[in-house]
Amino acid sequence: MHHQWLLLAACFWVIFMFMVASKFITLTFKDPDVYSAKQEFLFLTTMPEVRKLPEEKHIPEELKPTGKELPDSQLVQPLVYMERLELIRNVCRDDALKNLSHTPVSKFVLDRIFVCDKHKILFCQTPKVGNTQWKKVLIVLNGAFSSIEEIPENVVHDHEKNGLPRLSSFSDAEIQKRLKTYFKFFIVRDPFERLISAFKDKFVHNPRFEPWYRHEIAPGIIRKYRRNRTETRGIQFEDFVRYLGDPNHRWLDLQFGDHIIHWVTYVELCAPCEIMYSVIGHHETLEDDAPYILKEAGIDHLVSYPTIPPGITVYNRTKVEHYFLGISKRDIRRLYARFEGDFKLFGYQKPDFLLN
């Protein structure tokens, strides 16, 4: 009996010691698990939400950049140019704007496009948007002069001497081949600011010897559109606006011939809905656009765009307001109605500050 009690006591002692040891083990190793669990919970509740990236926007092959690969710092830049081309495509599809966005690829349009066969480039001329400088670039590329600085100003616009053939000078088959395979571009700026620049250049300052603007075109506009017949001043911007906004302006355009290129719409000049351009540059962002165009055309190692004077490309709303001051809302609205296609195709904001 005594031995049974001793055996029972021994078993009890072993069980007791086992319980103590288990408690010790639990106390010793529980904290790390609790900490780990707390950390895991903290991680799950405080980690920033990873937003699902939007699906990559499908860019048609013809809208993708065609030139060299850009460094990482500039990879975002081509998106701007692709968005410009996509905007044009969308506006071209808008039936409500069809009369303002479409034009036949006529000889008038082909005359505006200059060819650099050596580097497979087509440039559509849009006067009053820095075109003289782009012509100089192409003249050098064609080999007529070795540098931009060597080109005399009177040669730039003399198409018999500057070595720049017009697309219209080729056969139909050659025209189609170049339109399909060459790098094509042109430059735009705010449509109303461009008209102001054209008016100042041709009717106010007239830096080159072009007497026909003051002696033939201006009198023709005044006779037709000046309301006060007794007024003897030279052509005013108001006369110019009435002429451009007149739905029947074309009969005067025919009399003025190719001189109208300085103020007709970009649509009439370059047919952006009919010709698929590679890049559309904007005068307001020319500091970025010019190097990009040269790179995309594969000629950035051969020539540089001339230095751009500070501030010259900035949109000047004050100047626009000044020139349109005193002109009736009716005349301004008619002017906008004609150039609405240009505003929408190239993403320029509607000038409500003039229209309302």
From Swiss-Prot:
EC number(s) per entry: 2.8.2.-
Residue numbers binding 3'-phosphoadenylyl sulfate: 127-133, 189-197
Function (record text): Catalyzes the transfer of sulfate from 3'-phosphoadenylyl sulfate (PAPS) to position 3 of terminal glucuronic acid of both protein- and lipid-linked oligosaccharides. Participates in biosynthesis of HNK-1 carbohydrate structure 3-O-sulfo-beta-D-GlcA-(1->3)-beta-D-Gal-(1->4)-D-GlcNAc-R, a sulfated glucuronyl-lactosaminyl residue carried by many neural recognition molecules, which is involved in cell interactions during ontogenetic development and in synaptic plasticity in the adult. May be indirectly involved in synapse plasticity of the hippocampus, via its role in HNK-1 biosynthesis.
Keywords assigned: Carbohydrate metabolism, Glycoprotein, Golgi apparatus, Lipid metabolism, Membrane, Signal-anchor, Steroid metabolism, Transferase, Transmembrane, Transmembrane helix
Location of the protein in the cell: Golgi apparatus membrane
Organism field: Homo sapiens
Principal location: Golgi
Designated name of the protein: Carbohydrate sulfotransferase 10
Protein family membership: Belongs to the sulfotransferase 2 family.
Membrane disposition: Single-pass type II membrane protein
Residue numbers on the Lumenal membrane side: 28-356
InterPro entries in alphabetical order: Carb_sulfotrans_8-10, Sulfotransferase
Distribution of this protein across tissues and organs: In fetal tissues, it is predominantly expressed in brain, and weakly expressed in lung, kidney and liver. In adult, it is highly expressed in brain, testis, ovary, expressed at intermediate level in heart, pancreas, skeletal muscle, spleen and thymus, and weakly expressed in other tissues. In brain, it is expressed at higher level in the frontal lobe.
Effect of D190E: Induces a mild reduction in enzyme activity
Biological pathway: Steroid metabolism; Protein modification; carbohydrate sulfation
GO biological process assignments: androgen metabolic process; carbohydrate biosynthetic process; cell adhesion; estrogen metabolic process; learning; long-term memory; proteoglycan biosynthetic process
Enzyme class: transferase
GN (gene name): CHST10
Molecular function GO terms recorded: HNK-1 sulfotransferase activity; sulfotransferase activity
Domain of life of the native organism: Eukaryota
Gene Ontology cellular component terms for the protein in this record: Golgi apparatus; Golgi membrane; membrane
Record: glycosylation sites: N99, N228, N316
Cytoplasmic domain ranges by topology: 1-6
Reactions this protein catalyses: 3-O-{beta-D-GlcA-(1->[3)-alpha-D-Xyl-(1->3)-beta-D-GlcA-(1->](n)-4)-beta-D-Xyl-(1->4)-Rib-ol-P-Rib-ol-P-3-beta-D-GalNAc-(1->3)-beta-D-GlcNAc-(1->4)-O-6-P-alpha-D-Man}-L-Thr-[protein] + 3'-phosphoadenylyl sulfate = 3-O-{O-3-S-beta-D-GlcA-(1->[3)-alpha-D-Xyl-(1->3)-beta-D-GlcA-(1->](n)-4)-beta-D-Xyl-(1->4)-Rib-ol-P-Rib-ol-P-3-beta-D-GalNAc-(1->3)-beta-D-GlcNAc-(1->4)-O-6-P-alpha-D-Man}-L-Thr-[protein] + adenosine 3',5'-bisphosphate + H(+); 17beta-estradiol 3-O-(beta-D-glucuronate) + 3'-phosphoadenylyl sulfate = 17beta-estradiol 3-O-(3-sulfo-beta-D-glucuronate) + adenosine 3',5'-bisphosphate + H(+); 17beta-estradiol 3-O-(beta-D-glucuronate) 17-sulfate + 3'-phosphoadenylyl sulfate = 17beta-estradiol 3-O-(3-sulfo-beta-D-glucuronate) 17-sulfate + adenosine 3',5'-bisphosphate + H(+); 17beta-estradiol 17-O-(beta-D-glucuronate) + 3'-phosphoadenylyl sulfate = 17beta-estradiol 17-O-(3-sulfo-beta-D-glucuronate) + adenosine 3',5'-bisphosphate + H(+)
Residues spanning the membrane: 7-27
